[in-house]
């Protein structure tokens, strides 16, 4: 939100006005829509544009003599999978004074501790301090059960003038929001210390802008959720299922539940914060370089937009990277869950962006297909387990996915030039081809007919 001192109607949420159908067409809207903030004052006009991996919103309002540009992004640097998979994001708020006089304002950014769960009364939830910001956190359950309840989300700026309110007014119903909005509408810089029972926090950045002057406030976001409750798929039932590459030593000590790759790279949220602070400018520069090159294409804008829209899937929860760096993917996502597990080969068979932008990640999919999900017959199970481990082979193979894996192995070798890699896979590729011929072309006509 923004507050302009001495300006009538000068306090507004940094969003455009909500359409009436969103305010009044929802269940329980007659009671004020709870904590949605849909009734708060917002900007009259807004425009959204996308230059993947950057999104931009421009806000304007007749009451506010400031133009506001919000730029959202997270690192996306082709061939650099590690930095492109960081658990971070950024919102850059640029304020430009369009009046003939100097203006004073305060920028606010607040959040509830959404990690706090009433169902886990033994998990300690709190809001912790970090330089020029705060950390929403919930610790793991002491007995080690349900590790997925642990989570940490940091919100901070790079502005030393930032004032942090670590603890909103503690009450029920709408009281916390009421008091928070009172502070905003009065331009207060409230600085409450951390408290163990805090449920929401905010930061405030005072601004002084001369005529025509601009200033950018960079809100850094970082998170760390080291475990999950995801253990998916049926395990191999016998040596045939486990296949020729199986070595029990490869699976000693692997986590029972999915553990994200970044939790192996970073010790905790403070490590992520430190890395994001130290490398912010460089990661932005490299991401901007990709955006400039991509959007400078002479392809029709409709094509560029379509490709960019699909590239965004690589930055979504559809694509997961487990503790050892290998990719595992859903077919897509629901609002709060994955849809159809296992990097399904007859869905992911048609992906083209990943092998060309992040070829090392694409090759991990070939390794899973041939070295983990292929049994001693050459049969491939087209859905991989999570965490990745030998899978049962009680269902039919998917011919498009299995044929496609063979073709893609050749493509991936052409892209990478890694001959040792293709040599390691070749016996398994040959076994897969033999299985395909026996199963779908038993008369050896070169045509799928079974």
Protein language model features and the residues they cover:
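Beta-strand-rich N-terminal accessory domains
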Residues: 1-27, 297, 307-310, 315-317, ...
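Extended, loop-rich substrate-binding clefts of extracytoplasmic carbohydrate-active enzymes
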Residues: 24-88, 169-203
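Substrate-binding groove/exosite segments of carbohydrate-active enzymes
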Residues: 185-200, 206, 213, 217-218, ...
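Active-site-surrounding "flap" and adjacent substrate/cofactor-binding loops of secreted or lumenal enzymes
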Residues: 2-22, 239-270, 371-379
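Extracellular structured ligand-interaction cores
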Residues: 52-54, 86-92, 102-106, 112, ...
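Ser/Thr/Pro-rich, low-complexity mucin-like regions
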Residues: 66, 95-99, 103, 211-213, ...
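Polysaccharide-binding surfaces and accessory modules of carbohydrate-active proteins
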Residues: 70, 75-182, 186, 203, ...
